[in-house]
Amino acid sequence: MKKFNIKSLTLLIVLLPLIVNANNIDSHLLEQNDIAKYVAQSDTVGSFFERFSALLNYPIVVSKQAAKKRISGEFDLSNPEEMLEKLTLLVGLIWYKDGNALYIYDSGELISKVILLENISLNYLIQYLKDANLYDHRYPIRGNISDKTFYISGPPALVELVANTATLLDKQVSSIGTDKVNFGVIKLKNTFVSDRTYNMRGEDIVIPGVATVVERLLNNGKALSNRQAQNDPMPPFNITQKVSEDSNDFSFSSVTNSSILEDVSLIAYPETNSILVKGNDQQIQIIRDIITQLDVAKRHIELSLWIIDIDKSELNNLGVNWQGTASFGDSFGASFNMSSSASISTLDGNKFIASVMALNQKKKANVVSRPVILTQENIPAIFDNNRTFYVSLVGERNSSLEHVTYGTLINVIPRFSSRGQIEMSLTIEDGTGNSQSNYNYNNENTSVLPEVGRTKISTIARVPQGKSLLIGGYTHETNSNEIISIPFLSSIPVIGNVFKYKTSNISNIVRVFLIQPREIKESSYYNTAEYKSLISEREIQKTTQIIPSETTLLEDEKSLVSYLNY
């Protein structure tokens, strides 16, 4: 009996920790609909993230100061990244992930550092960190562009990593040789390496590529051809554009000796949108630095153009006054920006179009055309709807064939100004001619050419977000002939002409141009949490049963369906 009690007591002592541990696991990890939940009961930050490390697939390093804090509560582990963001915000922690480990610090451990670059530009350093997936947008690098000095504040692991990277890259550039000839390939991601040419009414507009720009820089502008010099695609605006945080207008103060860039060869390779560089290592590094700063992503702008003809009397009834005000009903008003070359106003385009559509039902307005063009900032968008007639010029010994082109031409060069407003350089040409298909001949048997009228508007305007630009207001006369007849009676042969008559009407038509600019932002990654309430279980089942032969789902698809059903 005594031996039995000793054995029982020994077995109880051995199994007691296992029983307690099993109960502890059951109380901490609860499985509900295949989604893990964790209940923390005054756990330290270190012990909490030890259990959390496997879900993130990263080793977690917790500082001593952060490890002193304790956490209590129930946590949903279905989305570890989201839970990490919320938890660190509530507890007062900061973190940084370098791709190999997750570093967690107390918010009081945040450090700052000012670093001076000598041989590389700030943009080159930022681009290097982004390419290596080391840059954290939560802790941006802020710097003085002209002095190549930057400031960074964040978790110690991030600050030390950026400082060490900047020092290493600076030393690499300073140790580059200047004697050995080498070759480099620089690939562009956001802009074109070769020149682009647009034709506008027989005139070529050349937008220089990066290769041409860099070559002009190396040759002190001597490579600029006469054709390109006469057709500058982007005239300078009078308003200074505010430099944004992501601006890449960095200086090159490190290149003080112009002889450094002598004997450098550049060749554009459009097939891969790359530039081939021949020179020593230092020259290649300088060219790479320049191209990196020029190769920036441009924002997209959608331009909706409305060409509208409105009866002059109805336009006055709409309340448009080109001298300063416009009103549409009792609840809307707009102020106008006057120009010496055109009448311009910024207004709510949707309300104006609604009024035009109402007049269109009464045949008092007509939408002549409505093209939609997608372009990039600082890139011209051209709409040209023209007609051409040809004239033969016959002399005593030679002859030639000339042409005259007229129609509607709209050339818009948009750019973003301060406060997100869209600034546009506009050139509008509207031409009309008589509709004679054949030439008339006078008594001397000489052809009488048709008459062509042109109206040209050139201006610069700034449009706030969500507003439209109204341009025009010039009047022209139109002649319209209409035959009015009595049904059935007018179709009787011979005597039917008595029951119909012809009317002529001369009206004054005002042509206006409405331009609606809109920024097209890049689509972000799909967040299933946003669509969770929109997709029902029945729709998911229909989606998975479209192809009967597919009886199984991939693991990612199973996770998505499980998450949406939760």
From Swiss-Prot:
The keyword Protein transport applies. PROSITE patterns: T2SP_D. Changing residue 296 to I: In plasmid pCP301. The keyword Membrane applies. One of its GO terms (biological process) is protein secretion by the type III secretion system. Residues 1-22 form the signal peptide. GO terms for cellular component: cell outer membrane; type II protein secretion system complex; type III protein secretion system complex. Keywords: Cell outer membrane, Membrane, Plasmid, Protein transport, Signal, Translocation, Transport, Virulence. Pfam families: Secretin (PF00263), Secretin_N (PF03958), T3S_SPI-1_N0 (PF21304). InterPro entries: Bact_Secretion_Sys_Channel, NolW-like, NolW-like_sf, T2SS/T3SS_dom, T2SS_GspD_CS, T3S_SPI-1_N0, T3SS_OM_pore_YscC. It is found in: Cell outer membrane. Disruption phenotype: Inactivated mutant strain is unable to invade HeLa cells and to provoke keratoconjunctivitis in guinea-pigs. The core secretion machinery of the T3SS is composed of approximately 20 different proteins, including cytoplasmic components, a base, an export apparatus and a needle. This subunit is part of the base, which anchors the injectisome in the bacterial cell envelope. Forms a stable homooligomeric complex. Interacts with the pilotin MxiM/SctG and the inner membrane ring outer protein MxiJ/SctJ. Belongs to the bacterial secretin family. T3SS SctC subfamily. Component of the type III secretion system (T3SS), also called injectisome, which is used to inject bacterial effector proteins into eukaryotic host cells. Forms a ring-shaped multimeric structure with an apparent central pore in the outer membrane. Necessary for the secretion of Ipa invasins. NCBIfam families: type_III_yscC (TIGR02516). This is Type 3 secretion system secretin. It comes from Shigella flexneri.
